């Protein structure tokens, strides 16, 4: 794997932690690590494309990298990232697909899933998420939860809040499965902090559910968490509207 593979595909643990609060559809954030690199390990014909990308000249980066995209994975990656940084997702998708053909990783499958959503192709995105899960089952290269959070973030950014509900419930049930809500434990597994999950999930629930359905939705976790988590959950539910009369 070349320089761009190292720069823009975070190590599994790093990616999992970062993905708990950010979405990989923001390619500019992924590229941030590149700015300080010296003596880049990249094909010489891509040096100008990388320099342009680092300087934020995305059109120039694409012009320099595109002629090599069929041959070099890093060229396809550069084009995909540059188009994504400009929010030109339909143009980014073919390059993510070309990259996946060369590097069929779970990470790249998630990129195809989130990019599909940003193109308005939710069903295609769901299929790529399934593919990512299948690959990750064998490779264990990333956190399944972090990947799912990225997909939810893409759905939220594209205004597909109702489609995010099943995935949100999946993440909710992870807390009930692991039972532990200690921040370090969650961080090391790419699971969002429990407080962050409560806050971010409410935005989706308010937009898609009747008020009297929100408390029962969170109530699915009652009795399934550690002591700290149960206390946090009770406090959260207690301040929500739609409480039953005492």
Give residue ranges: language-model regions.
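Eukaryotic alpha-helical solenoid repeat scaffolds
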Residues: 2-28, 157-246
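Alpha-helical segment of the N-proximal tetratricopeptide repeat
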Residues: 32-85
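Structural signature of alpha-solenoid helical repeat junctions
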Residues: 40, 71, 78, 104, ...
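"A position-specific structural signal for the A-helix of alpha-solenoid helical repeats
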Residues: 43, 47, 78, 111, ...
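Alpha-helical junction/boundary sensor with strong preference for TPR arrays
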Residues: 65, 72, 103, 135-139, ...
């Amino acid at each position: 794997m070349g320089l761009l593979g190292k720069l823009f595909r975070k190590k599994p643990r790093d990616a999992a932690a970062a993905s708990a609060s950010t979405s990989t559809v923001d390619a500019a954030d992924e590229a941030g690590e590149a700015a300080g690199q010296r003596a880049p390990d990249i094909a010489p014909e891509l040096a100008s494309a990388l320099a342009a990308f680092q300087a934020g000249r995305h059109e120039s980066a694409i012009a320099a990298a595109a002629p090599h995209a069929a041959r070099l994975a890093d060229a396809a990656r550069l084009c995909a990232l540059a188009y994504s940084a400009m929010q030109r997702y339909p143009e980014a998708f073919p390059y993510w697909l070309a990259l996946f053909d060369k590097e069929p990783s779970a990470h790249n499958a998630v990129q195809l899933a989130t990019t599909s959503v940003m193109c308005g192709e939710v069903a295609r995105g769901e299929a790529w998420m399934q593919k990512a899960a299948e690959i990750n089952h064998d490779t264990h290269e990333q956190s399944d939860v972090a990947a799912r959070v990225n997909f939810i973030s893409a759905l939220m950014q594209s205004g597909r809040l109702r489609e995010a509900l099943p995935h949100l419930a999946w993440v909710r049930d992870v807390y009930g499965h692991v039972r532990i809500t200690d921040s370090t434990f969650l961080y090391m597994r790419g699971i969002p902090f429990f407080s962050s999950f409560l806050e971010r999930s409410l935005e989706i629930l308010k937009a898609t559910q009747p008020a009297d359905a929100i408390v029962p939705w969170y109530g699915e976790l009652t009795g399934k968490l550690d002591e700290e988590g149960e206390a946090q959950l009770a406090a959260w539910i207690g301040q929500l509207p739609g409480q039953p009369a005492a």
